[in-house]
């Protein structure tokens, strides 16, 4: 796990915590050259002043960090849990490593796959299903227990504001 939290421990407990899946949620891996999905950078920039942001991925750590750096968003993230850091999704170990100390009602996961949603629900946090990836399927996200399903990153901010508590 890589963590570079700038705020102190007390401030961390007073913030909301948003965990993004990497491939298919943050990054469009179907493109010839990896790119952020439309609206993702704006969402990250909007959330970062009042949320701690993390990446929970089945991708390797060095690859994840390199891609986030190349796409100009690495500095927005306070932690990364990659495949070598924990048991594979949907196991909750990666989430525990990232935000295990924080109240569950201050945490959400945004992901495009059933494993993202199942992991979030097993961990006891809000799960937002992301449909902006053309491979994502609404019925799979619904069947996995997503609390909300959204079609564009811009829909996430209001849900996070209304449904997460900053303790």
Briefly describe each language-model feature range.
Residues 74-89:
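A short, structured active-site edge motif that brings together acidic residues
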Residues 41-49, 99, 117-122:
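Surface-exposed amphipathic alpha-helices with a cationic face
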Residues 26, 53, 109-110, 149:
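Conserved SAM-binding loop
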Residues 13, 49-51, 101-106, 163-167:
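Glycine-rich phosphate-binding loop signature in dinucleotide/nucleotide-binding domains
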């Amino acid at each position: 796990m890589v963590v570079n939290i700038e705020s102190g421990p007390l401030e961390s407990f007073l913030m909301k915590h948003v965990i993004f899946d990497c491939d298919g949620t943050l990054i469009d891996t179907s493109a010839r050259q990896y790119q952020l999905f439309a609206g993702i950078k704006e969402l990250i920039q909007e959330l970062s002043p009042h949320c701690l942001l993390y990446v929970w991925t089945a991708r390797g750590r060095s690859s994840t960090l390199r891609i986030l750096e190349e796409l100009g968003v690495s500095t927005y993230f306070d932690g990364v849990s990659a495949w070598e850091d924990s048991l594979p999704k949907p196991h909750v170990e990666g989430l525990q490593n990232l935000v295990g100390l924080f109240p569950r009602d201050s945490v959400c996961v945004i992901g495009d796959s059933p494993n993202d949603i199942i992991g979030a629900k097993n961990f006891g946090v809000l799960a937002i299903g992301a449909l902006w990836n053309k491979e994502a399927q609404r019925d799979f996200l619904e069947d996995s227990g997503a609390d909300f399903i959204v079609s564009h990153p811009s829909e996430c901010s209001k849900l996070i504001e209304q449904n997460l508590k900053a303790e």
